[in-house]
Curated annotation (Swiss-Prot):
Disulfide bonds: none annotated. Its main location: cytoplasm. It is found in: Cytoplasm; Nucleus. This is tRNA-dihydrouridine(47) synthase [NAD(P)(+)]. The gene is DUS3. Gene3D superfamilies: Aldolase class I.
Amino acid sequence: MTTETEKRALEDDTVESKRIKYDKGIAPIKPEFIVENPSVPADDRYVNDDDAEAGDRNGEEKGKKKKRGQNKKRDMRQQHEEVRLCSSLLDPSNPGTCRFGPEHCRSTHDVTTYLAAKAPDIDGVCPVFKSIGYCPAGLKCRWLNSHYEDGKLKRDQSQIDAYASSGQGEVNKISTEAKLALQKKKYLFEVSDNVIKYLDSQVQSDENIAKREEAKENNASYVEAPFKIAEKKKLDLRGAKIVSPLTTVGNLPYRRLMKTLGADVTYSEMALSLPLLQATNSEWALPKAHSSEYPGFGVQIATSKHWAAAKAAEVIYKETTHVSELNLNCGCPIDLLYRQGQGSALMEQPARLLRILKGMNASSGDIPVTVKIRTGTKDNKNTAKSLVERVLAENDVAAITLHGRSRQQRYTKDADWEYIKEVGAVVTEWNNKKEEDKESSETNRTNFVGNGDVFTHEDWYNAVNTEGVDSVMVARGALIKPWIFEEVEAQQYLDKSATERLDILRKFADFSLEHWGSDEYGVGLSRRFMCEFLSFTHRYIPVGILERLPPKINQRPPQWRGRNELETLLGSTDYKDWIKITEMFYGKTGDNFTFIPKHKSNAYESG
């Protein structure tokens, strides 16, 4: 006969056996979706946000080669067609002029030979032709049969007119004249030249002041700036849905996609000031934006010199038309930039940072200047608070963004939102003083934006409701889950089906072909950037297979299977599956396609 005590013990054992134990840092996936004896080690399956911030600018560390870790020296080149057609013959019915002449041109002028050697067309209608009514790639298009008939390229005039009237297209393209002037060092920097002279004198003055001890002498050495800063456009980021500047993955098609998914503010990939001033084509491709991004598009630059910052600010102001803010990167943690005194290294040189901001502010016309920083450069030594106090006192910045991690910490720990709150209080106090001061009350308030670990609508609202925080900048969360701002708007979790997620990728594919082109080279480039995108999106775990909410961005899952084959495919960590997904939009990979991801555990070379 079982006693009452024994019954209770049996009940306790039953409850204990049903209770699921969760390991810290492991995503709580329902048991029926967990794969037993996984083929892929958990260690190799996850990357961190450095990949988004560093992109392809990271430096290779000296020492022994490792089989794991980042592929920092990645070859990004994509091969062209074996038989190339001269660009003057893209439209044979309306040929252009070849500057080399048919006899000296390295590309063929024989259309028949080119078409015979060209790879088979991809099935379906050309996404670019469907969108804008014609295809700029002409005969080189991989979907040529959809808009080529009887030896002529088709044009849908009604679609061309509709696209033109919509005002869509890419903006912020530098003119050929300006580019040549920069390359020949004949560009007129009418504003920044005067600003630089003043800042140079301030550097000398600072060195002299450091040698003096009496405050009166210091005050006497102050020289009024010989220029007036232009009135800036108003920048109000309160409650704005902001996508962080992201290198490589933060390209134009991705940002355009995010605008369709609810983003209010986007930023260019980080551009280096010196290559901008040298008119490097690859660098000037970065400030380009889609018209849908403006207003709300910011250009981010990195620099270590005040003269380069001032000149870059002036040329961006003069040569672009759709820029809402100019952002200085003082948060990038990668070694290459840090060793050059750029990115987060500026936090260790406050005087230099302040000069750079002054130069940008004075040279950027009506474009407001903003800055992105970290808590500091070293663990357990936060310096952002004192730095922000100096920035507010000595510069009129429109916004300060604080990433709640140090450079040294990277992503080993959660973002420090308590410290973000502390710094936010400093900015709030400053704004309140400005409102009370009649002389400065007419100047725009300084926005304060937090950044770090926002992955759900709950994270977003918790952050925005933090005292002193105007809005939140989302980085990894917007890469892993591009519809995060739809969740913010709905204030609930959205369990997107695999088909819906595939539609998001399809939209990215269409945007990428419009941007990079539908020829062989453009398709290869688009495929590569979709693979980069998938290196983040595959990390999303559908909320419908989780035991409990909320999901955390730093949680690592055991290997899992989806609710259908497509969901499993979209969550695959295998690079071969990423390639398979791209083939749904860009056709089969050719022998000339290569993809080397950031992590050495995944690499692909066709053939």
